[in-house]
């Protein structure tokens, strides 16, 4: 603290820049096309088998095991209208949020609709499990630390989301959190 009181304006600015860069490194997400392809082909097949196994009446039927996860997901509403909106600009999806599965289900539904993937903020708790973290880190999720209350952190987070929108990355925002 003594050092801060006697620091020059330039030194203070450098320190502020370092803190902002550290916050940005904590927040930034990644998107890997290979992981996306795996997530939209292999994983849905496995989930479909699990969902079918939960229905004892369907276990005896080989055709029910071959059905895809898309048979378990219903997409209703103005899908064509959403596609037309995408032609006009960046898509921002703002649904209600009730569980940690919401971003997974919405991401898969967006894929089934033939739309490009969405970037989205996710709480740090979703990065605790190594398997979940791998997918979150490679499917466009950026980290949101809800415990950080510093104004600078919130500004860096807001700027990250703003720049993503300005660069035409489609986004998913859950205003209510979980």
Residue ranges and their predicted role:
Residues 1-92, 97-108, 128, 133-139, ...:
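Membrane-anchoring hydrophobic helices of lipid-metabolizing enzymes
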Residues 71, 89-91, 116-124, 140, ...:
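Structural beta-strand/beta-sheet cores of well-ordered domains, especially the beta-sheet scaffolds
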Residues 89-96, 157-178:
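Conserved Motif II region of HX4D acyltransferases
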Residues 95-97, 107, 121-124, 175-177:
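Glycine-rich, histidine-containing beta strand-loop boundary motifs that form or position
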Residues 108-112, 116-148:
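Metal-dependent catalytic core segments for phosphate chemistry
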Residues 126, 150-153, 178:
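Acidic, metal-coordinating catalytic cores used for nucleic-acid/nucleotide bond scission
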Residues 143-159, 171:
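Catalytic core segments in nucleotide and nucleic-acid processing enzymes
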């Amino acid at each position: 603290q003594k050092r801060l009181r006697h620091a020059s304006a330039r030194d203070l600015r450098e320190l502020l820049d370092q803190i902002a860069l550290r916050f940005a490194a904590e927040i930034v997400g990644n998107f890997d096309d290979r992981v996306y392809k795996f997530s939209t082909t292999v994983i849905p097949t496995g989930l479909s088998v699990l969902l079918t196994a939960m229905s004892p009446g369907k276990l005896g039927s080989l055709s029910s095991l071959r059905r895809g996860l898309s048979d378990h997901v219903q997409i209703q509403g103005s899908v064509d209208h959403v596609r037309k909106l995408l032609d006009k600009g960046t898509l921002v999806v703002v649904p209600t949020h009730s569980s940690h599965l919401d971003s997974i289900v919405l991401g898969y539904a967006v894929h089934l609709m033939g739309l490009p993937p969405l970037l989205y903020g996710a709480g740090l708790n979703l990065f605790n499990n190594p398997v979940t973290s791998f997918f979150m880190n490679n499917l466009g999720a950026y980290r949101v630390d809800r415990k950080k209350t510093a104004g600078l952190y919130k500004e860096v987070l807001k700027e990250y989301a703003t720049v993503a929108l300005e660069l035409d990355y489609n986004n998913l925002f859950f205003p209510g959190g979980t």
